[in-house]
């Protein structure tokens, strides 16, 4: 059985990137929560 994590920069950006987050209401909440917490990195 192969490992489940097969890294890909493109897939990572598309699924978890800033623009992907901003595209949905829930994603915008995630960014807002991370901003409020003072996270250095907001998204992938």
Curated annotation (Swiss-Prot):
Residue ranges of the TM segments: none
Record's keyword terms, sorted: Ribonucleoprotein, Ribosomal protein
Domain of life per record: Bacteria
Any GO MF annotation of the entry: structural constituent of ribosome
InterPro entries: Ribosomal_bL34 (IPR000271), Ribosomal_bL34_CS (IPR020939)
Gene Ontology biological-process annotations: translation
GO cellular component, as recorded: ribonucleoprotein complex; ribosome
S-S pairs: none
PROSITE patterns: RIBOSOMAL_L34
Pfam family, one: Ribosomal_L34
Family label: Belongs to the bacterial ribosomal protein bL34 family.
NCBIfam families: rpmH_bact
Full protein name: Large ribosomal subunit protein bL34
Encoding gene, per UniProt annotation: rpmH
